[in-house]
Amino acid sequence: MAKSPAAVKAEVRRMRRIRRIHFVGIGGVGMCGIAEVLLNLGYEVSGSDLKASAVTERLESFGAKIFIGHAAENAEQADVLVVSSAVNTSNPEVATALERRIPVVPRAEMLAELMRYRHGIAVAGTHGKTTTTSLLASVFAAGGLDPTFVIGGRLNAAGTNAQLGSSRFLIAEADESDASFLHLQPMVSVVTNIDADHMSTYGGDFNRLKKTFIEFLHNLPFYGLAVLCVDDPVVRELLPQVGRPTVTYGFAEDADVRAINVRQEGMRTYFTVLRPDCEPLDVSVNMPGNHNVLNALATIAIATDEGIDDAAIVAGLSGFQGVGRRFQVYGELPVDGGSVMLVDDYGHHPREVAAVIKAVRGGWPERRLVMVYQPHRYSRTRDLYDDFVQVLGEANVLLLVEVYPAGEEPIPGADSRQMCHSIRQRGQLDPIYVERGVDLAPLLKPLLRAGDILLCQGAGDIGAVAPQLIKHPLFVGESK
């Protein structure tokens, strides 16, 4: 029987002497979910951001005090400030808090505090964190366990990226981008893969990144569980160094939990799962691609370990409605003679781009892929330039939007115009440079053919393009 919100609040230990919690940058994807859970636990929550958004309006409707813009007075009544790694001590609210000796804590430290008195499940890895965390929330809910979850994307079924559950389980993403996942002390940790990304955090040293993942896994208690994808060569390399109980997953024959007989039919992927001492389990997920099979395998490994029955696992996976901006299908965009399928995706690393392209080719092999891509950060574009050139060259038609800087200064040679030149030199594709995403509709109109798949991808403001295109007069008029 589900507990009432009051009963959940009563069972969760309070942070003594903390009444009002202020978030600097409350509209951020990593911040708003924690704020929402704290609101539901009965804390007073305030927060500031540079502009209003649907996220800040939602939090305001739940009782949060929202300030637009950063100002010293916003923080004066707070008992603690929560900040992301993007906020520094020059921020007037942080400066005021430090002057008044109000604690200033990283976002991950507040998440760790929420996890402290629960059975925490932390999902780490360069790729697949959000989808795996979301699948876990779906399967645990199907199993009647009603978890608390904090996700880096909007879970479509819940309409939010965070929710206070009635059980002892808390499922959350563990962020390696700033090494803040080291604050977490979960009972179960997942590592989906380890790739060279956010290398400035690690001084450009990949060995340091690998050691940090081992340190994260050793935050588990000696009776905890590390769930590791052995299809990833770096994770496999680190496996002998993990001094905790482990369960491995993947397509590899030596994986503890593995997938066989994979087939893709459009958006839906079917496969059979083999587990130790269990009957084979036939499952499906409403997501394309082998990368999503791996995300589902991690979920199945944990659900099986927690005793969730197979029927609930199957139901939670098959009924999963996806996550915002993770191969999110906006619908059919009318064009001459038919329509194109419009898809939005958050992928911003060459490995993620390659996985999505492979999924499109697997599910819709006869259709052209028209791709609108926006690189994210000049530093990532520079560090992974050759990989981007190779993978983006696999599209049938490519439009490259200028790099989304995410606060960085331009780096010579690490921009979309130069990347267009490099892709063109390969002789397979003639990409189109686009300075701003708002210019896309008239460019796309003559390029699209009936039956195409139009993929808008990247982690920057390109996320606004698909919802704009579906309503754009140039395309809406086609259906009349």
UniProtKB/Swiss-Prot annotation:
Pfam families: Mur_ligase, Mur_ligase_C, Mur_ligase_M. ATP binds at residues 125-131. One of its GO terms (molecular function) is UDP-N-acetylmuramate-L-alanine ligase activity. Keywords: ATP-binding, Cell cycle, Cell division, Cell shape, Cell wall biogenesis/degradation, Cytoplasm, Ligase, Nucleotide-binding, Peptidoglycan synthesis. Its main location: cytoplasm. Pathway: Cell wall biogenesis; peptidoglycan biosynthesis. It is found in: Cytoplasm. GO terms for cellular component: cytoplasm. It comes from the Bacteria. The keyword Lyase does not apply. GO terms for biological process: cell division; cell wall organization; peptidoglycan biosynthetic process; regulation of cell shape. Its EC number is 6.3.2.8. It catalyses: UDP-N-acetyl-alpha-D-muramate + L-alanine + ATP = UDP-N-acetyl-alpha-D-muramoyl-L-alanine + ADP + phosphate + H(+). Cell wall formation. NCBIfam families: murC. Belongs to the MurCDEF family. This is UDP-N-acetylmuramate--L-alanine ligase. The gene is murC.
